């Protein structure tokens, strides 16, 4: 089992953890409907990059 040789100071511990935060998912607005969706995903209305690509229940 690995055992540390020297204690890591609170400052170094904080520097090590500085990139552990979560980031918000990037969102995009569908140009044809104005709906917000995840980037590179089809919007709930079935549109992707201004074109209808999936049939929905309302269609």
UniProtKB/Swiss-Prot annotation:
Alphabetically list the UniProt keywords.
Answer: Ribonucleoprotein, Ribosomal protein
> What do the Gene Ontology cellular component annotations say?
large ribosomal subunit
One Pfam family name from the record?
Ribosomal_L32p
Q: Which GO terms describe its biological process?
A: translation
Name the domain of life.
Bacteria
What GO MF terms are annotated? Answer: structural constituent of ribosome
For region Disordered, the annotated ranges are: 1-23, 35-59
Composition bias (Basic residues) maps to 49-59
Read off the HAMAP family from this record.
Answer: Ribosomal_bL32
- NCBIfam families listed in its UniProt record: rpmF_bact
What does the sequence similarity comment in the record state about its family? Answer: Belongs to the bacterial ribosomal protein bL32 family.
Name this protein carries in UniProt: Large ribosomal subunit protein bL32
| Native source species | Paraburkholderia xenovorans (strain LB400)
């Amino acid at each position: 089992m690995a055992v540390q040789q020297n204690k890591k100071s609170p400052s170094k511990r904080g520097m090590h953890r500085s990139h552990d935060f979560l980031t918000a998912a990037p969102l995009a607005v569908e140009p044809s409907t104005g709906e917000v969706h995840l980037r590179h995903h089809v919007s709930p209305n079935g549109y992707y990059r201004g074109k209808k690509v999936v049939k929905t229940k309302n269609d």
